[in-house]
């Protein structure tokens, strides 16, 4: 760890301009880790730019204090697309970067900080720290840069800590997922000691729903189907649902959270239509390795929670995914 820390700080110190980025469809771990790391990099005397796709990230506005430097990939001018250092968070594969992979490929040096198993299209980096034992990338950042964080001005330090606490909430589902271990609670307690208020962060992250968003969730839940001896839960949402309720689905929590814990369910499969013929798939399971399924479709994640995209009709997606999930369950059950 000491050698990793030293190399990380040295690469940042030598960089002229730094790119921060994460996987497609950024979540509370990848995106908020990037926000936190950008502020730490600024404290270390360097500037950086956080680049995402055109996703709606407004649900994280409560964290913002007006100091973050961010741009969407589509907004970058040609002269802004060259970086001396690219830092990729919560992702270790070019396949998971979308269009932004060209920015990373062109960078003079690359750092990868991730807690997923190594995937296809592995990014070749000067420094690659991929450690699945960590619950979230935020935990990796804190473990590497805790000393610097403790030296930051109070306001900036609190910003960093709130962002890092959000990475815990996102990837442990508020300390209930199987990846919640002793180290996670130690990490969280350190953040609380530095000023984080857990009740506030929980409320901001999980409880900010409009009536329209809840109607959308209700319509999604009404599509629930049970398959394979009631062990598989399948549900979906469509563009028509989001249009009817005048919401952007990206601005709310993944709908799988509303159905976790149903008795007898071993796998949750949720399809959300992003645009015509394109579905974002979320897979959850306490038994089978859903990451293996997601990887087949160019996605990835963790053993118990993974995602990918499907290009085709809802019927085609449902048919293929259910076959894959049933096959995985049959193999698991022998």
Predicted regions and their residues:
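Short, motif-level signal for alpha-helix interfacial/capping segments enriched in acidic residues
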Residues: 2-7, 91-93, 148-151
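Short acidic, glycine/serine/threonine-rich loops at helix termini
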Residues: 32, 61-64, 100, 122-125, ...
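An acidic intrinsically disordered interaction segment
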Residues: 1-6, 101-111, 133-141
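Short alpha-helices
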Residues: 115-187
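Short hydrophobic "helix-edge" motifs at membrane interfaces and signal-peptide entry regions
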Residues: 17-18, 104, 160-162
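Active-site cofactor/cluster-binding pocket
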Residues: 67-127
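Hydrophobic helix-and-loop "lid/oligomerization" segment in the mid-to-C-terminal part
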Residues: 2-24, 30-64, 71, 76-85, ...
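Glycine-rich, phosphate-binding/catalytic loops in enzymes
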Residues: 36-38, 103-106, 129, 186
């Amino acid at each position: 760890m000491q050698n990793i820390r030293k190399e990380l700080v040295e690469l940042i110190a030598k960089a002229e301009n730094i790119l921060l980025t994460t996987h497609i469809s950024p979540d509370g771990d990848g995106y908020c880790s990037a926000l936190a790391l950008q502020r730490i990099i600024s404290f270390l005397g360097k500037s950086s730019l956080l680049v995402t796709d055109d996703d709606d990230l407004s649900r994280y506005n409560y964290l913002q204090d007006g100091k973050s430097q961010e741009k969407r990939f589509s907004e970058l001018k040609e002269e802004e697309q060259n970086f001396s250092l690219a830092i990729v968070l919560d992702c270790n594969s070019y396949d998971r970067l979308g269009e932004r992979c060209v920015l990373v490929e062109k960078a003079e040096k690359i750092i990868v900080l991730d807690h997923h198993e190594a995937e296809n299209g592995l990014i070749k980096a000067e420094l690659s720290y991929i450690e699945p034992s960590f619950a979230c990338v935020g935990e990796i950042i804190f473990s590497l840069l805790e000393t610097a964080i403790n030296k930051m001005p109070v306001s900036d330090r609190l910003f960093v800590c709130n962002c890092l606490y959000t990475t815990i909430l996102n990837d442990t589902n508020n300390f209930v997922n199987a990846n919640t271990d002793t180290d996670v609670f130690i990490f969280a307690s350190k953040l609380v000691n530095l000023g984080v208020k857990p009740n506030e962060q929980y409320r901001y992250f999980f409880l900010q729903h409009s009536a329209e968003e809840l109607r959308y969730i209700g319509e999604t839940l009404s599509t629930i189907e049970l398959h394979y001896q009631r062990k598989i839960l399948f549900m979906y949402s469509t563009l028509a649902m989001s249009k009817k309720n005048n919401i952007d689905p990206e601005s709310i929590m993944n709908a799988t959270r509303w159905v976790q814990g149903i008795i007898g369910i071993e796998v949750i499969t949720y399809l959300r239509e992003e645009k015509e013929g394109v579905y974002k798939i979320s897979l959850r399971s306490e038994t089978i390795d859903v990451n293996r399924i997601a990887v087949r479709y160019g996605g990835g994640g963790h053993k118990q929670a993974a995602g990918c995209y499907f290009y085709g009709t809802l019927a085609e997606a449902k048919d293929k995914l259910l076959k894959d999930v049933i096959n995985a369950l049959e193999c698991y059950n022998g």
